[in-house]
């Protein structure tokens, strides 16, 4: 069953030159072994205080998790948006 967090679940993430390398999920380190895709979303820029500017990363970890992470580019925080089965 796919798990989805519409607002994102904060995760401690380490990035190398802006590319996520690992993150912690439930206290377990997840090393990213493959990046499947990445894209940016920049919307609601016309509404002060409501701008959404994110960079999404679909990744595979060394624990065989397929995940969708994103970095909020306004706050520099990393969040987990989805875990796929």
Model-inferred region functions:
Residues 1-85:
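Non-catalytic peripheral regions of nucleotide-handling enzymes
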């Amino acid at each position: 069953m796919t798990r989805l967090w519409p607002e994102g679940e904060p995760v401690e993430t380490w990035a190398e030159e802006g590319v996520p390398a690992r993150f912690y999920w439930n206290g377990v380190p997840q090393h990213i072994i493959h990046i499947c895709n990445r894209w940016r979303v920049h919307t609601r820029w016309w509404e002060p205080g409501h701008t959404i500017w994110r960079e999404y990363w679909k990744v595979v970890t060394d624990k065989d998790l397929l995940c969708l992470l994103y970095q909020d580019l306004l706050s520099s925080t990393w969040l987990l948006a989805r875990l796929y089965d």
